[in-house]
C-alpha cells in the first residue's frame, strides 16, 4: 500500500477530504498547503448523508385517522422514547385496571370487613385492601404463584374475571412484546455499517466520461442479493410551462450488464457512463458551477444473519461531485489475504480530464474528422461524372441496327439501354434478352460475333416463315421461302445487308 501511495503521490496530487464542509485542500509531496477551494453555500437537501429524507407531511386533516388503521406499523415507526413510554404506560394501566376489578369484587362481597372471620370464605383469600388485590393480580399475571392468595370456589364472578384477565394479558403481551421485538430486529442499524464515499467524482474510465462513487461493507457478514440504484433529482420546466420541483430521473449504473448486482465483500466503485442517454449528457465542468441537482443512491440487500431486507441511502449534491478526480486504491495484497485500508476510503486524487461535456466532445470530434465520402470539389470531376452518366445512354449505339430499332420502342425495358462491355454488366442485362440470346452470350469465345450472326438468323427466320405462309402462287413468284433474299432487288439486298453490319 505504501508503494501505491508513493506511486500515485508522485504522479498525481492527492486530495484529502473532510466531512466538516471546510473545503478541499490539495497537498502533494514536498508541497505546502495550496489555495483552499471554498465550497458553495450549503443548500437544502432532499436526502441527508445519513439517508434520512427531509420531508414532513402537513395539513393531513381527517387523513390522520389512517394511522390508527395500521396501529402496529405506527408503533414500530415511532421513536424509541415513545415506544418505551407506550410500553410502560400500557402495562401500568392494565395492571391498575385489573387490580381495581379484584378490589371491587372484594368490596362488593364484603370481603374487606369479614376477611378475619373464622368460618367466612372470601372470593380471594387473604385480600384485605387494594395493595393486596394488586399483589394478587401481579402474582397471577406473572404466574409467580406464591400460594398465599388464591381464588376460592365460592366466587363465580372471580372465576370469570380470572379468565378475562388471562385473555387480556395474552393480547397485551403479544402486541407490545411483538412490537418491541420487531423494532429491535429492524435492519436499520445494519445500514450503519454500510459506507458511502463522501464525494462522487467525474473522470475518464475506459475512454468514456464516467460518474463514480464508492460503497463499502464494514462487516464480515455479506449482503445477499445486494442491488444499487441511483436517482437524479432536478428541477425543470416542461414545454407546457409546468414546473417540476423534484423531477426524478433514473441513472443507469449497469442495469443491462448486471453491474448493479453487487458482490459487496470489499469496497466497490459504482460507475454511471455519461453518454447520449444520460441526464448528464450536456454537463461540463463550467456548467457545474450553475447547475443544481442531487444524486440519490439507494443500496438494498438481504442481511445474511437475519434474512431481513436492509436499505441504505445517501445523496450527492452538485458541490459534492469532484470533476477530474479518481478514488485512491484501498485494496492491497498481503500474505495469504487481501487487506482493505478504510483510512483512504474517501480519498481522491486529480487526473487529467477534459473539462467539456460529452455533447461538446462529440461535436468537436465531428467537426475535426474528415467525411467518409468527400463531395466533388471541382468542375473537372463533375464533368467526368456527367460523361459517365451519358455513356450509359450511348451504349445502345454499339448494338446491331435491328436491336437499335427495337430499343427505340417506349415499352422496351430500360435495362437494355445500359448494357456494358464488362462481364458483370453483361450478366446483369442478359436477364432481359430472349432466351436464345442468353444462351449464345453464355458460350465462351467470340460472343459478340456469334451474337450478331445469331441475331441476323433470328431476324431472318420470321421473314422466311412469313414467305412460307403465302399462297403457292406467291411463293413461286418469290422463289420459295428459302430464297427470298436472292429474289430481292439489288438495292434492297444492299440495304438489308447494311442493317446487320
Swiss-Prot record:
Q: Mind listing the UniProt keywords for this protein, alphabetically?
A: Glycoprotein, Ion channel, Ion transport, Membrane, Phosphoprotein, Potassium, Potassium transport, Transmembrane, Transmembrane helix, Transport, Voltage-gated channel
Q: Which species?
A: Mus musculus
Q: How does it assemble?
A: Associates with KCNJ5/GIRK4 or KCNJ6/GIRK2 or KCNJ9/GIRK3 to form a functional G-protein activated heteromultimer pore-forming unit.
Compositionally biased, Low complexity: which spans? 18-37
Residues listed as glycosylation sites in the UniProt record: 119
Give the protein's recorded name. Answer: G protein-activated inward rectifier potassium channel 1
Mechanisms controlling activity? Heteromultimer composed of KCNJ3/GIRK1 and KCNJ5/GIRK4 is activated by phosphatidylinositol 4,5 biphosphate (PtdIns(4,5)P2).
For the motif Selectivity filter, give the residue ranges. Answer: 143-148
One example of the protein's molecular function in GO is: G-protein activated inward rectifier potassium channel activity
Pfam families this protein is in? Answer: IRK, IRK_C
Q: Where is this region: Polyphosphoinositide (PIP2)-binding?
A: 182-209
Name a single GO cellular component.
Answer: external side of plasma membrane
Which InterPro entries does the record cross-reference, listed alphabetically? Ig_E-set, IRK_C, K_chnl_inward-rec_Kir, K_chnl_inward-rec_Kir3.1, K_chnl_inward-rec_Kir_cyto, Kir_TM
Q: Is Glycoprotein given among the entry's keywords?
A: yes
Q: Which GO terms describe its biological process?
A: potassium ion import across plasma membrane; potassium ion transmembrane transport; response to electrical stimulus
Q: Which residues cross the membrane?
A: 81-105, 158-179
What membrane topology is annotated for this entry? Multi-pass membrane protein
Return the annotated region ranges for Disordered. 1-40, 456-501
Keyword Cytoplasm among UniProt keywords: no
What stretches lie in the bilayer without crossing it?
A: 130-141, 142-148
Subcellular location per the Swiss-Prot or TrEMBL entry: Membrane
What spans does the record annotate as topological domain Extracellular, numbered to this chain?
106-129, 149-157
Q: What does this protein do?
A: Inward rectifier potassium channels are characterized by a greater tendency to allow potassium to flow into the cell rather than out of it. Their voltage dependence is regulated by the concentration of extracellular potassium; as external potassium is raised, the voltage range of the channel opening shifts to more positive voltages. The inward rectification is mainly due to the blockage of outward current by internal magnesium. This potassium channel is controlled by G proteins. This receptor plays a crucial role in regulating the heartbeat.
Amino acid at each position: 500500500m505504501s508503494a501505491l501511495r508513493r506511486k500515485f503521490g508522485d504522479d498525481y496530487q492527492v486530495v484529502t477530504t473532510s466531512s466538516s464542509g471546510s473545503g478541499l485542500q490539495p497537498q502533494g509531496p514536498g508541497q505546502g498547503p495550496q489555495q483552499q477551494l471554498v465550497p458553495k453555500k450549503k443548500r437544502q437537501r432532499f436526502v441527508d448523508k445519513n439517508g434520512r429524507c427531509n420531508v414532513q407531511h402537513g395539513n393531513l386533516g381527517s387523513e390522520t385517522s389512517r394511522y390508527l388503521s395500521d396501529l402496529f406499523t405506527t408503533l414500530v415507526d415511532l421513536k424509541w422514547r415513545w415506544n418505551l413510554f407506550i410500553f410502560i404506560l400500557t402495562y401500568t394501566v392494565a395492571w391498575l385496571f385489573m387490580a381495581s376489578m379484584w378490589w371491587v369484587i372484594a368490596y362488593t362481597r364484603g370481603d374487606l370487613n369479614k376477611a378475619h372471620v373464622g368460618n367466612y370464605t372470601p372470593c380471594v383469600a387473604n385480600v384485605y385492601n387494594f395493595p393486596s388485590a394488586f399483589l394478587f393480580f401481579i402474582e397471577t399475571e406473572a404466574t409467580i404463584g406464591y400460594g398465599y392468595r388464591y381464588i376460592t370456589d365460592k366466587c363465580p364472578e372471580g372465576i370469570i374475571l380470572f379468565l378475562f384477565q388471562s385473555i387480556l394479558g395474552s393480547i397485551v403481551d403479544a402486541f407490545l412484546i411483538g412490537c418491541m421485538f420487531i423494532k429491535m430486529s429492524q435492519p436499520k442499524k445494519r445500514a450503519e455499517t454500510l459506507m458511502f464515499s463522501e464525494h462522487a467524482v467525474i473522470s475518464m474510465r475506459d475512454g468514456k466520461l464516467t460518474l463514480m462513487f464508492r460503497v463499502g461493507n464494514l462487516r464480515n457478514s455479506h449482503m445477499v442479493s445486494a442491488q444499487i440504484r441511483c436517482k437524479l433529482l432536478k428541477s425543470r420546466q416542461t414545454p407546457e410551462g409546468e414546473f417540476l420541483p423534484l423531477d426524478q430521473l433514473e441513472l443507469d449504473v449497469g442495469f443491462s450488464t448486471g453491474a448493479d448486482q453487487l458482490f459487496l465483500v470489499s469496497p466497490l466503485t459504482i460507475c454511471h457512463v455519461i453518454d447520449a442517454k444520460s441526464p448528464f449528457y450536456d454537463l461540463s465542468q463550467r456548467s457545474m458551477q450553475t447547475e443544481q441537482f442531487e444524486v440519490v443512491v439507494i443500496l438494498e440487500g438481504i442481511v445474511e444473519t437475519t434474512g431481513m431486507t436492509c436499505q441504505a441511502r445517501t445523496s450527492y449534491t452538485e458541490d459534492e461531485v469532484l470533476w477530474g478526480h479518481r478514488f485512491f486504491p484501498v485494496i492491497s495484497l498481503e500474505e495469504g489475504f487481501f487487506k482493505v485500508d478504510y483510512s483512504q476510503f474517501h480519498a481522491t486524487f486529480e487526473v487529467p480530464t477534459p473539462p467539456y461535456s460529452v455533447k461538446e466532445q462529440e461535436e468537436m470530434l465531428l467537426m475535426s474528422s474528415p467525411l467518409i465520402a468527400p463531395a466533388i470539389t471541382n468542375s473537372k470531376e463533375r464533368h467526368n461524372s456527367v460523361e459517365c452518366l451519358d455513356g450509359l445512354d450511348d451504349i445502345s449505339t454499339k448494338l446491331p441496327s435491328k436491336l437499335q430499332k427495337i430499343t427505340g420502342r417506349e415499352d422496351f425495358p430500360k435495362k437494355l439501354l445500359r448494357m456494358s462491355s464488362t462481364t458483370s454488366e453483361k450478366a446483369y442485362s442478359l436477364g432481359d434478352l430472349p432466351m436464345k440470346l442468353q444462351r449464345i452470350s453464355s458460350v465462351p469465345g467470340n460472343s459478340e460475333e456469334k451474337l450478331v450472326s445469331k441475331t441476323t438468323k433470328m431476324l431472318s427466320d420470321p421473314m422466311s416463315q412469313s414467305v412460307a405462309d403465302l399462297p403457292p402462287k406467291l411463293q413461286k413468284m418469290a422463289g420459295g421461302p428459302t430464297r427470298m433474299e436472292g429474289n430481292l432487288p439489288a438495292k434492297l439486298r444492299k440495304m438489308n445487308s447494311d442493317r446487320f453490319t
